[in-house]
Amino acid sequence: MSDQDGKKPLGLSGGARSGRVNQSFSRGRTKSVVVETKRKRVMVPKPGAPSAAAQNAEGGKRDKSVPDAEMDRRLKALQAAKARESQEAEERVKAEREREEERNRRRADAEAKEREEREREEALKAKEEEDDRRKAEEEARRNAPPEAAAPAVDPAAAATPRGGGKAAPARREPERDNKRENRSRGNDGGGRRAGKLTVNQAMSGGEGGRQRSMAAMKRKQERQRQKAMGGSVDREKVIRDVKVPETIIVAELANRMSERVGDVVKALMNNGMMITQNQPIDADTAELIIEEFGHRVQRVSDADVEQVIDTVEDDEGKLLPRPPVITIMGHVDHGKTSLLDRIRQANVVSGEAGGITQHIGAYQVTTESGAVLSFLDTPGHAAFTSMRARGAQVTDIVVLVVAADDAVMPQTIEAIAHAKAAEVPMIVAINKIDRPAADPQKVRTDLLQHEVIVEAMSGEVQDVEVSAMTGQGLPELLEAIALQAELLELKANPDRAAQGAVIEAQLDVGRGPVATVLVEKGTLRQGDIFVVGEQWGKVRALVNDQGDRVKDAGPSVPVEVLGLNGTPEAGDVLNVVETEAQAREIAEYREQAAKDKRAAAGAATTLDQLLANAKADENVRELQVVMKADVQGSAEAIVQALEKIGNDEVRVRVLHYGVGAITESDIGLAEASGTPVIGFNVRANAPARNAANQKGVEIRYYSVIYDLVDDVKAAASGLLGAEIRENFIGYANIKEVFKVSGVGNVAGCLVTEGVARRSAGVRLLRDDVVIHEGTLKTLKRFKDEVKEVQSGQECGMAFENYEDIRPDDVIEIFEREEVERSLT
């Protein structure tokens, strides 16, 4: 270790590193490598030396790379920033000082105002007490005996020393004590006014606490003034007649009685009813409360709103003759519209789709003799039962059209029933008399079965043979109608408020809701306010059957009415009222009554009934449709026709139907339920068409009700499951049973009838009783697998998953086929 003397030992933390290292290589070679170590230089200022910022600020050594102009600019910016900062600080201090002064000023004002109010209040109170004391002294002086009057003054005189005697200090001592006590109480509170004696504390004896407010003092003064003026007498209670409907809100009841709502609620609570002012109560409860408050009760019903409708009988002296209303009825394609066309000298049939009337047409005809006749042309299709019923209800005479070559048909019988139900006279028009196969006598004979006896067969019903094509018999028909109208002596009062029946209603794109109205009484004028069913409106325009605008319409005149707020139901009654408020009130009442009726019908269904219906509907498949039509009557007729389609397995359900064009909301409903949209004489608007294309909703348009019903019936038939039919193709008798390994029991059979097929179904009969039904596992003839075996041949059969086979059993062989079903 002698060579190591004077050197420091190795360690983890040693002195300076050497700049050389030895690098070793293979075979003992080494190489000396110079190593450079980079270290971060840390500048530590010496104690007492100024900082760099200070040196720069004091004009020390600056960077020579910065020009003098730049350095001057930087210094000016720094000085400007410092000046701006000091200015902002001064402004903040000034603003804070101003805010503090404003707060102090407001606080002082509030204190001064409070002090003034308190002093005014105390002054008023002191004045009141002084007045009370003076009144008490006067009362005591007035009631005291004369000899006691002189001594009564002595205590007052003794209480006031005249010469500044020794009594004064003795009297001031308690005041000083009170002041000291009040000051100590103020200090205990620690408040802003601690130690200060106020007038309020001096008057209240230092008790503190809340005193009477200024408003209370004013109320007391007002009561005293009224008492002095003799106003303390209770006012006489006003007894009112309070109208009570079936239900009334508590606040409305209080308003009608002119009582406080709180008093009414309190009275209800006293009677055991915890009800707020916005809750309704029934009429009996309201009557009890009204009697408790001393008022008189007038019970009214919600239906009383309809009493404004004029239902009085017309004076006989004001009745004038009116045109008869004739309804043309009969079976479809029996020539009703063609006959009316011939009478009107017009062509309506060409405008009807398929030549079939699908609306109630209302027309007015003037005959050659000058008589005015109003005609209603009803549809004859089976779907329009409700239309024919409405036509019979508003008519005076029914003309029953029967084709001479077709005789009495189902809708003819229905028309007879409607006429009898409406108790209106009937005239039989035997049409198509010009046809070669015409047999009018057969028509008369067939009518006898339905208790319609014509004059030719000693009855009272007139019958006329006519031809709509040639015009034969039309004068006789008009003469018969005029004769019947003359016998009826039809009259009406044209000078009263109008009343009519809605024959048809529709939603027109350009005109809005339009109703075809047959005026029955009075005169309907432009500008009249009316209510019809659940709708109301003001007559904006009247259009006659020729399409011309008219100012008014008298009795038995059919017109189109514009100006409704909604589409009414066909068959609704139109009544003219005086004000718009009455019309709106009646319409709202009827709408609410209809809602209540529907809700009651739904509520009447019990849970057991709902469960039973749901269980019954599990096996019923539905075809759902959304339908829009041009008029209300057609929509109702189509819905009735569609609901009749179906059986125990399939039915048609109309999710929604309405009047007017197909809209985007209809498409949305159809898409949500996966149903098609049917348009009858209407089209979809542009947004609806775009929505249908995007959502894949099918829209189908129809103009003939036959095609619509047939297509829906075909679609509903597609929901029916196919009918499975069995065809027996053969029989085989088992002669012997063999045990075959890998197969099981095999029956040696003789085909006695028909043919045995490998793919057919089989039944095993034992003593004519079916004991197994299944399929064949194998069918062999002479050890060969075959597809079929003809009658008279022997074969071997094995059943699938069945082994109980015995000799003399009979095998029945059959095939199944699926047959498509359709609704009839």
Curated annotation (Swiss-Prot):
Region (Disordered): 1-234
Keyword check for DNA-binding: no
Residues reported to bind GTP: 330-337, 377-381, 431-434
InterPro entries in the cross-refs: EF-G-like_DII (IPR053905), IF2_assoc_dom_bac (IPR013575), IF2_II (IPR044145), IF2_N (IPR006847), P-loop_NTPase (IPR027417), Small_GTP-bd (IPR005225), T_Tr_GTP-bd_dom (IPR000795), TF_IF2_bacterial-like (IPR000178)
S-S bridge residues: none
Region of interest (G1), residue spans: 330-337
GO terms for cellular component: cytosol
Comp. bias (Low complexity): 145-159
Compartments, record wording: Cytoplasm
GO terms, molecular function: GTP binding; GTPase activity; translation initiation factor activity
Region named G2: 355-359
Region (G5): 467-469
Coiled coil: none
Alphabetical UniProt keywords: Cytoplasm, GTP-binding, Initiation factor, Nucleotide-binding, Protein biosynthesis
Biased composition (Basic and acidic residues): 59-75, 82-144, 170-186
Region of interest (G3), ranges: 377-380
Region (G4): 431-434
Function: One of the essential components for the initiation of protein synthesis. Protects formylmethionyl-tRNA from spontaneous hydrolysis and promotes its binding to the 30S ribosomal subunits. Also involved in the hydrolysis of GTP during the formation of the 70S ribosomal complex.
Family: Belongs to the TRAFAC class translation factor GTPase superfamily. Classic translation factor GTPase family. IF-2 subfamily.
NCBIfam families: IF-2, small_GTP
Protein name (Swiss-Prot/TrEMBL): Translation initiation factor IF-2
Species: Jannaschia sp. (strain CCS1)
